[in-house]
A protein has these predicted regions:
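Metal-dependent polysaccharide deacetylase catalytic core of the NodB/CE4 family, i.e.
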Residues: 2, 6-8
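Short acidic/histidine-rich active-site segments
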Residues: 104-126
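Short, glycine/acidic-enriched loop or turn micro-motifs at the edges of active sites
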Residues: 3, 39, 64, 112-114
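Mid-to-C-terminal alpha-helical segments outside catalytic/metal-binding sites
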Residues: 25, 127-164
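Non-membrane alpha-helical structural segments and their capping/turn regions in soluble enzymes
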Residues: 9-20, 38, 124-131, 146, ...
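Catalytic pocket-lining loop regions of alpha/beta-barrel enzymes
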Residues: 11-107
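Metal-coordinating catalytic core of metallo-dependent amide/deamination hydrolases
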Residues: 1-2, 81
Length: 164
């Protein structure tokens, strides 16, 4: 659920209306939310604040905003989804976010078939390519790749309430 202002259709007002309604449904059912927010940082945050969307947690899918915006979501207890974009040469902002954020609030994503990590960029994305994302995160955070795999797996289990 969320807002995507990259394209003009559907219009922003309609997107905001249905995003708000979907947040209400998530609150009523006490489910975490998976938020898609593209070129819509302010409106996404405003609507989430307006609808108290923080209580059941969730993830900001394919996080692509600044470290300052990341801090807002992290302070609210949300996870940030990190995928192939972190391997791109021009993803300076996202690399800064990964460096500053705790592993305890990170989940790994593919966004398949899109956003394929380097060195496979331009091909159809596949979950098998997550190893490149893990390697990049390990380099940015100066930690062991096995630790990243273990912690992000635990995070996904918590987020999706697997085994609870």
């Amino acid at each position: 659920i969320g807002l995507d202002y990259y394209y003009d259709e559907p219009g922003r007002d309609l997107q905001k209306k249905w995003f708000a309604r979907q947040l209400q449904v998530a609150a009523e059912t006490q489910m975490p939310v998976i938020i898609h927010s593209r070129d819509a940082a302010k409106d996404t945050l405003d609507i989430m604040n307006e609808h108290c969307a923080w209580q059941n947690g969730g993830v900001i899918h394919c996080f692509s905003y600044s470290p300052e915006i990341a801090k807002i979501y992290l302070d609210k207890g949300f996870y940030l989804g990190i995928g192939g974009v972190v391997t791109f040469k021009n993803s300076k902002k996202l690399k800064e976010v990964v460096e500053m954020m705790p592993l305890s609030q990170m989940v790994l994503e593919t966004d398949s078939p899109y956003l394929t990590p380097v060195p496979h960029r331009g091909k159809r994305n596949d979950s098998g390519y997550l190893t490149h994302v893990v390697d990049e995160i390990a380099a940015l955070k100066s930690c062991d790749r096995e630790e990243i795999i273990r912690i992000t797996r635990e995070n996904a289990h918590k987020l999706y309430r697997i085994g609870q």
